[in-house]
C-alpha cells in the first residue's frame, strides 16, 4: 500500500479518509490537480490585467461592502486584510484531529481549479498537513454561511506567518515554524483570501469526524444492547427476520441480523423464558437502532457530496470564460444533516440509558443494583443517575441549530445556516453517547455474570473477557468513576472493520 494519498478528482469518502488517518498517509497534489489549479490562476491573472469591471471579492470589498471598488495595486493587501480581519474566533480550541481534517478538505476543494488559488498556496497547506502543523482554531465564530469564515481565517493565518499552530505537541508562533522550515510567508494574490475563507470545511471536518465515530458506536450500541438483552434474560423472537422483512427499513434489518449473529450459540438466549414480552428498550432495538442507522447513512451521503465539492465564491469557469458569484458556501445542507445526526445519536443514548435502568431494577432474578448484599452496597445505583443526566443533556443539545438564523453584514447575508453550532453540538452528543454506552456495558457485563453457569455466544464471551482484563467484576462498592473512564478507553480502543463505515 502506498503511503501517499494523491489529491485528485477521485472521490473522497469515509473509507478513504479513514485509511488516510489510520495509515498516517502523506498528501501530494496529483498532476491533474496541479494543472487545474495553475490553469485557473493563470486565467484569473490575465482576466485582471485586461478587466476593469468590478468582480465580487476579487477587486471589491466583501459582504455589504461589495460595491466598493478596489484598485489593482491593493488587491494583494485586500486579501491579506480579509484573512486578518476575519480571524476573530473564540471559545474552546478545535480538536487537533478535526483541524487536520479541515486541512485535507480545504486542499481537496481548492484542487478542482474553480477557485483561483496559487499553486504555492495549496502546496503550503499540503506541507502543513504532512508536517502536522495544525493551526490554532476556535469553536465559536462561524454562522455556517459565507462559509465557515472565522475558523477558516484562523486556518489560513499561518500561511501569512500569523497566528499560532500546534507543532510537535507545543503551541508556537506560526512565524517560528516558517523559520524552522525556511519557508517564506505566502503573499496572497487576488481572490486567494476569499478562496481560503469561503467554504464549509469546519462543518465538513466535524461531520466526517463524527460520522466515523457514529458508525463505530452504532455497532457498539448493537453489541452492548445485545449483552444487556441476555443479562435481562430477554427473548430472541423479536429479532426473527420474518418480522423485519415485512417492514424492510435497511437499518432495522441490519440491526436484527447483527443481534442474531452476536447471539449465535448462546446458552443464555436459548434457555426457556418465563415472561411473554420484553420492554421496548430491548424488544425494539432493531426499530430504534435501525432508524438511527438510516439517519446516519443519509448524513453520510450528504457529506460525501459536500467534501467533493467546490464551496468558495465566486467560482471561476475557464471553459465558458465566466466568473460567477453564487452561494455554494451556504451550509444549509450540512446544517440540516448535522441536526438529523445529532437526534439519531441522542436516541441511541436515550434507549441505552433505559436498558441500564431495567438492569438495576431487581427484576428477573437479578439483584437490586447488580451487587451482592444490596443495602450495605449501593452497587450500580448511581451510574444510572449519571447516564440519565447525560441522556437528558443530549436531548437538550439535540434541539436543532438549523431552525435559527441571524441577519449579518448589514442585511446582505440575511439568512445563515448556523451549521457550525450544529457541528459542535453534534460532537458533544457523540462524546456523551460514548459515556452512556460505557455505563450500559458496565451494567450489562455485571448483570450477565449472574446468569452463570450458562454461557453467552463465543463472540460475546471473548468480548467480555477482554473487557474484564480492564474492568474487574464489582463484588463490593468501589469508586466507579474510574471504571467509567476505563470503560470509555476500552470502547475507544475497540477496532471495527472499514466496511462497517457504510453500514451503521
Model-assigned labels for residue ranges:
Residues 2-25, 29-36, 40-43, 48-51, ...:
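C-terminal auxiliary extensions adjacent to catalytic cores
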